[in-house]
């Protein structure tokens, strides 16, 4: 059976890895998932990400999870726009996540950016997900 929403699967693997206090999680590789992982590294939510291969030889992304004082840095990671219901917002309508403490991942014509950067650039786009 094929995977319907690979980004939601990535978020779920990260959530499950944090719940199980894993150091690393592995996700099947795609360019958009690698962009999201790099975004999470730049925002400080995960330690690192790198392209690797599974034991079967399939490309994957190895994500090193981040903890602070034994607690996961990511409290919440949630998919917003999904294949069956895409959510687009203009720069004026972009939501503030956790009152500004979290970030919305926005896919714009300028690439993947945070809600703050999208507002600064004056561009809207598809809301991929929320992280806090």
Swiss-Prot record:
Keywords: Ribonucleoprotein, Ribosomal protein, RNA-binding, rRNA-binding. It comes from the Bacteria. One of its GO terms (cellular component) is ribonucleoprotein complex. One of its GO terms (biological process) is translation. InterPro entries: Ribosomal_uS8, Ribosomal_uS8_CS, Ribosomal_uS8_sf. One of its GO terms (molecular function) is rRNA binding. One of the primary rRNA binding proteins, it binds directly to 16S rRNA central domain where it helps coordinate assembly of the platform of the 30S subunit. Belongs to the universal ribosomal protein uS8 family. Part of the 30S ribosomal subunit. Contacts proteins S5 and S12. This is Small ribosomal subunit protein uS8. It comes from Francisella tularensis subsp. holarctica (strain LVS).
